[in-house]
Amino acid sequence: IFFVYFYQRNLLYNPNENNYLNDKISFNYKEIFIKTDENIKLKSWFIEKDLKKFKTILLFHGNAGNLFNRVYKLNELNKLDLNILIISWRSFSGNEGKPTEKNLYHDAEEAVKWLNSRGVNNKNIILYGESLGTGVAAEIGKRNVFGGIILESPFTSITKAAKIYYPYLPVNIILKDRFDTIEKIQSITTPILIMHGKQDNIVPQKMGLELFEKAN
């Protein structure tokens, strides 16, 4: 119990995991750094086509890897008439700082502000969260109205997900970061698309179905 309590964020956030690194980049992008008010620079990729004509996807990645691990996804999204901004959380992709639930929300808000500063209003932004990023998208989506929200492989909460892997631990007591999406989703007025595969071996599909039912 003591190990899990003190090292839980090392288990939850895995910036050094590397998979899908051999995908060839088939899009043009600018590497930018979004500065937080704590002076942390968040490495990000920006695929800009036409900010006035097309909506902009703001992509929040999952709990492992870096920007290069999302090339396969960006290759597909780039086929659509969309601008795309993908940010890398603090401590990921060489960024400074420590990842926590509160800090990830802050990073996401800074990305929204960055787009706003370039003339993109919230109704032209589509929040796209994958796995851990779905918890961030839900929180940011609860705070404001956006053009849309996409949740790919979402969990109901980190607490419930942790119970699957650590059924013998009192996770509801010891967890610091909870990302309680199931309690937020009814407060979101932005249209939501939920995608969840049957063969997901990390987050069970039933969690996506629970969120769908709760949202409706």
Label every PLM stretch briefly.
Residues I1-K35:
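An N-terminal hydrophobic leader/cap segment in hydrolases
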